[in-house]
């Protein structure tokens, strides 16, 4: 069942989104060679809790981390651990924040220092596909309009869309109906209505779309070992069109601490 939200409830989700975006900004400032993914996780959890929120992922279906940290060919659901970032890596950071009972969910894939042109194209093309999908999140459109826009933008950049992983509704729970595929046909699928809130999240690879499960039962990898990217917004469908609740611009209220404080956080 699709649960629609009132404007007041969407505002509450946006406040969770403010904390989430500030968390991603904090982590971006820490991403450099030699930093371990568990250090990023520790800094994220500390920051989220300092803002009166909780990390949604921690304990969700037994997941042990506060964030998902997925480097290189790992597409999603990476458990933070001892892996230390290297120059030339790409790393997806997926964060969920719960504030006053409402969830926001977003992800970005970051380069570690300088990356080659294929990786630059991977990140830029996947982010463009996210924005293409968001632009279709309007009342009266169909889910297939969103899915097709994502697919067209990603494949137009020469990327493979991972078909076995999808976006989803979000609200008081992290995963709600409907599913949001990253491929499809315009005019097909559920009708988009005012009050729906969706996690739009293209996941792509620079190679083939097939995936494999990692040995820990969580991490999902590109089967061919090609680098992968994941970008995600939480988006509310309003009468005026899409409202991104996790934009890269943060509010002053939830702004991250200065860089010197970030350096002490982990």
What residue spans do the PLM features occupy?
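Active-site neighborhoods and metal-handling regions in enzymes and metal-associated proteins
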Residues: 1-266
């Amino acid at each position: 069942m699709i649960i629609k939200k009132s404007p007041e409830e969407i505002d509450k989700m946006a406040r969770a989104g403010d904390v989430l975006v500030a968390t991603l900004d904090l982590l971006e400032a820490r991403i450099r060679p030699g930093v371990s993914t568990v250090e990023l996780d520790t800094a994220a959890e500390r920051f989220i809790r300092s803002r009166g929120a909780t990390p949604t992922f921690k304990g969700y279906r037994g997941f042990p981390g506060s964030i998902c940290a997925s480097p290189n060919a790992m597409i999603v659901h990476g458990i933070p651990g001892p892996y230390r970032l290297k120059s030339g890596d790409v790393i997806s950071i997926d964060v969920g924040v719960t504030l006053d009972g409402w969830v926001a969910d977003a992800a970005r894939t970051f380069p570690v220092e300088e990356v080659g042109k294929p990786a630059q194209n991977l990140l830029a093309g996947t982010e463009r596909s996210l924005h293409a999908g968001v632009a279709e999140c309007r009342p009266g459109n169909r889910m297939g309009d969103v899915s097709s826009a994502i697919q067209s933008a990603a494949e137009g950049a020469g990327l493979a869309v991972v078909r076995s992983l999808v976006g989803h509704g979000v609200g008081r729970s992290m995963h709600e109906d409907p599913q949001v595929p990253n491929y499809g046909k315009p005019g097909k699928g559920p009708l988009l209505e005012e009050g729906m809130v969706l996690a739009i999240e293209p996941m792509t690879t620079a190679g083939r779309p097939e995936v494999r499960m990692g040995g820990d039962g969580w991490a999902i990898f590109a089967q061919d070992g090609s680098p992968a990217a994941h970008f995600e917004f939480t988006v509310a469908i309003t009468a005026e069109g899409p409202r991104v609740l996790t934009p890269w611009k943060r509010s002053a209220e939830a702004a991250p601490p200065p860089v010197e404080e970030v350096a002490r956080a982990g």
